[in-house]
Amino acid sequence: VVALSGGAATTTFTKVITIVDPVVLPVTFESTSINYAWNDFSGGNVTVVANPHSNAANNSTRVAKMVKNAGDPWGGSWIGLGGPIDFSANKVFRMKVFSPRVGAKVLLKVENAGNGSIAFEKEVLTTVANAWEDLAFDYRTINASNAYHNIVVIFDNGTPGDGSANFTFYMDDIRLTDAMPNSKIDLPVTFDVAGVNYTVTDFGNNQ
């Protein structure tokens, strides 16, 4: 910037301006030009970290780490997007989660940036411990005419956290898809269909 005075003298001022890209779906935490700024509340704490459990299920370089500390039972965090979410075609949220235990509740909520009462949420349970799984949140009944700008995540809503490993979760690849995963088992049983839980129940001392 060069400021001209009434005479011949000039003053030069240099300032570095950093321009960051807005957060948009899918939220992958991989971009170095996006500030993934989470807003923590009531004991929740989210940071973007190197993926500590990289494997075939999730080989991302970076993921979000949620620690639920002591606080309110609804402690969590939210992130604002650069614009309203487009639900015109896809209405099923997917999010990869690494949970320390089976049966942990995962609530994913969307809110209007100016009016928090305009919101929609779904809650699902984790089905594996100490492994990545791709959870699905059925948003097919959402009022798509409303504008939703914020994504809220709460783990174990209704239970206060304690900041321990038992309340430490990881999440990644928040995105919209067009269908719920196929969770029922159809014949023939090949054990090869993604999204199907091939749980086998033993009986008669058989293992």
Where are the language model's segments positioned?
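Beta-rich carbohydrate-recognition modules and glycan-binding surfaces
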Residues: 20-207
